[in-house]
Amino acid sequence: VAMTGHDLFPWLSTAVPLMGALAGRIFCRDPHQLKTSCLLWSVLSLIPIAASDVAMPEGPLLLYLLPIAAAISLLGQPVHRDHRLSWLMTLVCLGLGIGVIVHQGVFAHLFLLALLATTISLLVHHHTTLWPISWWGIGLFGLAGVSVIMTAFTDPPISSSAAFLTCVVLIPLLPFHTGYLTALTRLPGNLPSFAAVLLPSVGLHFMVGMLPTIPITITGLVSLFALAGALYGAVKALAQTRVRLMLSYGSLSFFSVLWWFAAMSHM
């Protein structure tokens, strides 16, 4: 069966950043050219997205937001040899994130698993004395990966509960917020600033389809945890002296308000 344009563009949207990461290895010896290449590929990934016309319940904004966020995070990082891996991994994560949003069913789950596995690998291999390894945060991303598998191979209500667990890790909700905080504080280079947009965007895509299947009793608990998370995140953000932690807890407070709004709308 011939692949139509409607089928081709989602795959092309996913492939462009991944091809950019592969092509970028040519410039690994020259950090300036590598950064320029990664920037160009990030911008180029907007073209197939604009042409794909993929219909999504949450609208097309998330798809356009991801390449723009990737490009901005790359622009904000100074040229240095130590940042080469993070530039290439920005394109890899961009391709996987787009793949989660533009595809459906098993392909979306596979791309999300790959994104979670990539995040876990980066967190395991990149940590410093200032930011020691956080096994609790890594474990939460592992839990999200197991939940993705359960979502793909089980039926409701188990699949709905598994999808909910995935969402509360990607869009931080107390007490599952440590994974998001770990990504924003431990990932190398420019990846924390990109992950701050990528993870909630992917989670929001899943939340739109998941929330209507969650029982009212669960959404009531979500609203309570969301209010607690908003207060906790705000207080913790005010008490921080390190910028990454301040932004991380500020994000927790913001996304807790989003969870509260989503839960109350469902109720």
What do these predicted regions represent?
Residues 217, 221-223, 235-236, 266-267:
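Transmembrane helix-loop-helix hairpins at the membrane interface
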